């Protein structure tokens, strides 16, 4: 009697377990992931006297969630990227790259659409090029005579040259009576006469 009761209880427990398990939602435990492959194209010109090397260029996904470097041919790859919207950033010495918004479609089996965030331009291929070159050092301006003339010291020297050489000639054309009356007015007001400052008036 006891074995029959045990077998009956075991069968009832098994049926209950299978029935309860069938009512739970089934999850695969992992999302569908995709691979993003792109290329970084850098001009052949040098930056700050050094050629840009692919090994020094870093590509970042979602602010550091994934980081990769370029292969010698300039390509990069991100593996196990879930469907959704992602952000790709390129860090290269001497260049500024626009961040790229990448939309990975789950409906179309990993179809990728890329858009530059700076210019809002869509990319048919994930080929990233710098928007501009960056200068980290201020370039020294070449020597220029005009820069010296326009400086405060140059303007002061020019004014002194006018006073010393041109003012005496201008004074010669002024009526002596008018000059005398002007000097008297300046003395009465406590202002020194301009002619007293000139070598010709001494």
From Swiss-Prot:
UniProt keyword Glycoprotein present: no
Compartments, record wording: Membrane
Stretches that traverse the bilayer: 148-168
Region (Disordered): 179-202
Entry keyword set: Membrane, Signal, Transmembrane, Transmembrane helix
Cross-referenced Pfam families: EMC7_beta-sandw (PF09430)
Listed GO CC annotations: endoplasmic reticulum; plasma membrane
InterPro entries in alphabetical order: Carb-bd-like_fold, EMC7, EMC7_beta_sandwich
A single GO molecular function term of this UniProt record: carbohydrate binding
Secretion signal, residue range per the UniProt entry: 1-23
Topology term for the membrane: Single-pass membrane protein
Transmembrane helix listed as a keyword: yes
Biased amino acid composition, Polar residues: 182-202
Family in the record: Belongs to the EMC7 family.
Protein name: ER membrane protein complex subunit 7 homolog
Organism expressing this protein natively: Arabidopsis thaliana (Mouse-ear cress)
């Amino acid at each position: 009697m006891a074995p029959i009761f045990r077998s009956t209880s075991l069968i009832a427990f098994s049926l209950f377990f299978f029935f309860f398990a069938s009512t739970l939602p089934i999850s695969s435990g992992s999302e569908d992931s995709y691979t993003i492959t792109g290329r970084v194209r850098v001009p052949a010109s040098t930056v700050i006297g050094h050629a840009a090397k692919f090994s020094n260029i870093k590509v970042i996904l979602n602010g550091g969630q994934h980081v990769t470097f370029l292969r010698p041919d300039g390509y990069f790859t991100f593996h196990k990227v879930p469907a959704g919207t992602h952000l790709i950033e390129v860090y290269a010495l001497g260049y500024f790259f626009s961040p790229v918004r990448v939309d990975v479609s789950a409906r179309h089996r990993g179809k990728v659409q890329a858009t530059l965030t700076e210019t809002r331009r869509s990319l048919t291929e994930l080929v990233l090029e710098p928007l501009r070159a960056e200068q980290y050092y201020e370039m020294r301006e070449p020597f220029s005579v005009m820069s010296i003339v326009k400086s405060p010291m140059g303007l002061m020297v020019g004014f002194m040259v006018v006073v010393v050489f041109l003012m005496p000639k201008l004074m010669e054309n002024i009526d002596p009576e008018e000059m005398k009356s002007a000097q008297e007015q300046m003395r009465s007001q406590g202002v020194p006469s301009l002619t007293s400052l000139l070598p010709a008036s001494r």
